[in-house]
């Protein structure tokens, strides 16, 4: 893979690539843009059930290069242990590319709203934490029993 600009000391924004099975990635991106407006630093790669691994890897590589703004790239995948995560993990590069699994809509919105200059590692933690905080058992919450998070 060609080198991605490292986020250390860079004023660039952390960019993102949502990678998923089926059309989940495209739909998450579309939903986020409907809620907060369009943005250019996050894109989606949907891996079809019968897609070739090398072709998927090349598509992710192109997406990373397309959105990179100098602050690193966060690959957000749908499920730990799945093909999208396994392929995305090939791109891990300290300070330049990180992978967070279990992507949901609050995570995409969080990344979209981060300001330039936030280091990649911090952005990854903030996005992960936002995803966790967005998970509730609605029945418990409505019954006053708290939340899962």
Where are these regions (language model features)?
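N-terminal loops that bind phosphate or other acidic moieties
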Residues: 1-149
């Amino acid at each position: 893979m060609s080198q991605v600009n490292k986020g250390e000391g860079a004023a660039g924004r952390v960019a993102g690539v949502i990678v998923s099975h089926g059309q989940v990635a495209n739909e998450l991106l579309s939903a986020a843009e409907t809620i907060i407006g369009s943005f250019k630093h996050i894109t989606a790669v949907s891996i079809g059930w019968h897609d070739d691994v090398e072709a998927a890897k090349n598509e992710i590589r192109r997406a990373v290069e397309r959105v990179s703004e100098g602050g690193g790239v966060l690959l957000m995948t749908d499920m730990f242990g799945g093909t999208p995560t396994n392929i995305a993990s090939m791109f891990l590069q300290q300070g330049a590319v990180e992978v967070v699994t279990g992507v949901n809509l609050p995570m995409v919105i969080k990344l979209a709203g981060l300001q330039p200059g936030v280091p990649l590692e911090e952005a990854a933690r903030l996005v992960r934490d936002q995803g966790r905080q967005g998970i509730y058992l609605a029945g418990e919450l409505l019954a006053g029993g708290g939340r899962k998070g």
